[in-house]
Amino acid sequence: MILVIDNYDSFTWNLVHYLMELGAEVQVVRNDAISAGQAVTSGAKGFLISPGPCTPNEAGISLELVGACADAGLPLLGVCLGHQSIGQHFGGQVVRGGLMHGKTSQVSHDGSGVFAGLPSPFTGTRYHSLIVDAVPDALVVNCTSDDGHVMGFRHRELPIHGVQFHPESIATQHGHAMLANFLRICGMPVKALA
């Protein structure tokens, strides 16, 4: 089961739908309806922190869950606000980066983590005004946009991954493949799409 932390964002349900299409059992809880301790002892094989309209400091258990997953060595994927929460937890700065609502960018990656087996570059859809800047040493930047911003990173040693853009957007290429890679990181089977 994948436990999805919903940061009160409609994009959460698109992510859930994609995960379910790939064969995952998914449980969704709001960011203020569970503690990080309850989350990591829920039996979930992996965790996804959703996008949301606020900052990591205002995102319920999101920051605390990053730490709990890190302590337990559990797989975690952060999308947009979730990505920012991972970056901030490990010592990065979350700063204003210009309004990018529904804009596409070419994103280039190194083929690691959730980007394994994907062509580079591809189109990613961005819905954000904040970005992670000054990425800490614990995280490896593995994806950048054509305008030079960090679009993805992975932890050097832990199964923790973040993407700034939205894999669940219809305008993002290879969204299902990125989420399938995350399910594999979680040790879960992946259903082939027709």
Where on the chain are the PLM-derived regions?
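Short hydrophobic/Thr-rich beta-strand motif most characteristic of the beta2 strand and flanking loop
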Residues: 25-31
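Catalytic beta-strand/loop cores that center a nucleophilic Ser/Cys/Thr
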Residues: 111-157
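Cysteine-nucleophile active-site neighborhood
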Residues: 41-116, 123, 179-180
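Active-site-adjacent helical/loop segments in soluble small-molecule enzymes
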Residues: 12
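Phosphate-binding/catalytic loops
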Residues: 5, 121, 162-173
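Acyltransferase
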Residues: 170-194
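Two-component/phosphorelay signaling modules centered on CheY-like receiver
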Residues: 17-25
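Extreme N-terminal starter segment of soluble prokaryotic enzymes
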Residues: 1-3
